[in-house]
A protein has these predicted regions:
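Nucleotidyltransferase catalytic core that binds NTPs
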Residues: 1-310
């Protein structure tokens, strides 16, 4: 345990023999840094949550309360303001009972993005390092959001270390996924099992949801066989902030990448006001995708395209 760990003094004082001095709160940053250090020893002191904006509140674990960390996994190919809008709304309005203290964005690996495109030729796949950078550098992403940049294969071990470290210090921590209404609808329901969660939170902050009354006729006659009932809790956080911004998706962004002239790509006719850190993205596109007009922006069915985009 490092000397600056929030419970270092507690352990030096004698552990359980001095339980009366146990800290009621502790910064989540320390626990993430410790768990992450095993993945990347060179980044032991890498910053976790940004502190460059006003009114920053460091995510704190609270003893005796549920502490929820939401997992926002997706393609982010590329990330756009809808992602930021969804995270911001859920973090602020998820409910006091959940006590959501932070979110972790998990851009999926390049290989999974390629699988999503099926048999599409020359698909637009932004490298994970770029997608991570666009999410981290965007001022629209809330300060209590951390971007996980390691391979997906390392995620579950990282989470286990993080969870074990937090609980061993006397705190309770829960993980739940967050998705947009394109993943939870009348027709289908997102399963958070891939991320070892049994709870998910959804909001129509970024686009309308078809399960909200008044969207259209929701009752249909269907016949089928139900095999097993998975344990799943869904929390819906409705948008209550007035008129939404126009819908946008990563697919829309890729279509613009293919179709926009180089002189318009960085303007409002292109990616400005839609993609996160659009200037950084445009620079990369112009440098790395000289033949972008010939690239595929949307998946083509063939092999499995089960990796959902968010």
């Amino acid at each position: 345990m490092s000397a600056d760990h929030p419970f270092a003094a507690y352990h030096r004082a004698g552990g359980t023999a001095r339980a009366e001095v146990a800290i009621a709160t502790a910064p989540l940053t320390h626990y993430i840094q410790e768990a992450y250090h095993e993945l990347d020893p060179a980044d032991e002191e890498a910053p976790i949550f940004r502190d460059d904006l006003e009114h920053t509140v460091e995510p704190l674990l609270r003893r005796g309360f549920r502490n929820t960390i939401i997992l926002a996994a997706g393609g982010y190919n590329p990330p756009h303001y809808g992602h930021a809008e969804l995270l911001t709304h859920v973090l602020h309005h998820g409910g006091e009972d959940l006590n959501i203290i932070a979110a972790i964005m998990i851009p999926i690996d390049d290989t999974n993005l390629k699988r999503k495109f099926g048999i599409a030729e020359n698909p637009i796949i932004l490298p994970k390092s770029l997608r991570v950078s666009l999410c981290r550098n965007s001022p629209l992403i809330p300060n209590n959001v951390w971007v996980y940049d390691q391979p997906e294969t390392e995620w579950h071990a990282f989470r286990s270390r993080l969870e074990a470290s937090i609980t061993s210090s006397g705190f309770t921590v829960n993980f739940m996924t967050v998705v947009g209404p394109d993943h939870i609808s009348i027709a289908s329901v997102h399963s958070p099992a891939r991320w070892s969660c049994s709870e998910t939170i959804v909001s129509d902050a970024c686009r309308p949801a078809d399960f909200v009354a008044g969207h259209h006729k929701n009752l249909e006659t269907r016949c089928g066989t139900v095999k097993g009932v998975p344990e799943l809790t869904i929390r819906f956080v409705p948008w209550t902030e007035g008129q939404r911004k126009p819908n946008v998706s990563s697919t829309d962004m890729r279509k613009l990448i293919v179709s926009c002239d180089a002189t318009e790509l960085g303007s409002t006719k292109g990616l400005a006001g839609k993609a996160l850190c659009h200037e950084e993205l445009v620079q990369w596109i112009l440098r790395e995708l000289p033949e972008r007009a010939k690239m595929s922006a949307v998946p083509v069915k063939g092999e499995s395209t089960a990796v959902h985009e968010w």
